[in-house]
């Protein structure tokens, strides 16, 4: 089954409002946990710079049978539903297959 990668950057407007940002991120964490309990192979985390400082965005990896179904799941991410991030979804292709 193919893997899909969602890349994201938090919108600058939300960098100021830490309480709202934290609330939405916590909803996102709960959403990922729920999907894992449903048996979906998903990983999600944030990126840090060379000083281990967060703020450069995040990455989500999802195993799904096709792009359409991956997109359907991703669009339910609270970070997307609340317009917290600029995001893009791509399929990862293993050239060694």
Predicted regions located by residue number:
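Conserved, structured core segments of small domains
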Residues: 1-97
